[in-house]
Design a protein with these regions (language model features):
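Membrane-interfacial loop-to-transmembrane-helix junctions in polytopic alpha-helical membrane proteins
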Residues: 10-23, 52-56, 60-63, 78-88
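Alpha-helical transmembrane segments of multipass membrane proteins
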Residues: 36, 73-77, 101-102
Length: 135
């Protein structure tokens, strides 16, 4: 009586994040690939925006691009495997988004990017919580 045609209970289907774990993981990975890709393109992203000032003080643009693409690659692998690799990939994705958010905030506290990527990082840590406790 409490099941839907797909075998889920009503409580499960009422939870908007019930089946969204893979979608969240995919979105975190895609955004990280996009960030790494933008930094790889010719031209200097760091020199065109003050928001990237803090990142430029830490490392060159190519280093950030390599780091973001490496994290995104591990994230993509985590989409297809289970176990510790999946959890490690989510830790990497969430932490990279969080680091990016903090750097944007330090470079331009009044910008909107820091809040946006901060929310994305929180979504990543929420996914990690779900993956760790199999919720």
């Amino acid at each position: 009586m409490g099941e839907c045609p797909f075998g889920h209970t009503r409580i499960e289907t009422a939870n908007p994040f019930y089946d969204a774990k893979q979608a969240i993981h995919l979105a975190l990975t895609a955004i990280m690939f996009w960030l790494g890709g933008i930094l790889v393109l010719p031209g200097s992203t760091f020199s065109t925006s003050h928001s990237y000032r803090a990142m430029e003080l830490i490392a060159r643009e190519s280093i950030w691009a390599l780091a973001f693409l490496a994290v995104a690659t591990v994230g993509a692998i985590g989409l297809f495997v289970t176990g510790p690799i999946r959890k490690i990939s989510v830790i990497g994705l969430a932490t990279a988004h969080g680091t990016f958010s903090v750097c944007l905030f330090l470079g331009n506290p009044s910008g909107t990017g820091s809040g946006t990527y901060g929310i994305i990082a929180c979504l990543g840590y929420y996914l990690l919580y779900r993956r760790l406790f199999r919720i």
